[in-house]
Amino acid sequence: MSISGITNTALSGMRAQTMRIGAIANNVANSSTPDYARLNTSLTAAASGGVQATVSPTASDVDPATELTDLIEAEQANKANAVVFETGADMWEMLMSIKRD
């Protein structure tokens, strides 16, 4: 995989987790709204590499413990993707400095 492929994969992961965090925020904000359908985020492998997020309503009720657990998981995944992106960017900078020398 190329360095740009690494960074693009990490970026797609961060975008997907951002969508997931948005769905969680909606669930918590609307937990007491009558007839609110909880939003669920499904993550799948994208054809071009990386991750694709799909948000869809579900029939289940909002459970604060589940939302908190999902939020922690999404934050950790976002941090991991940020580290991968940073590593790819560092590798790119190193290659460019070698090329200049």
For every predicted segment, state its role.
Residues 1-101:
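Amphipathic alpha-helical polymerization modules
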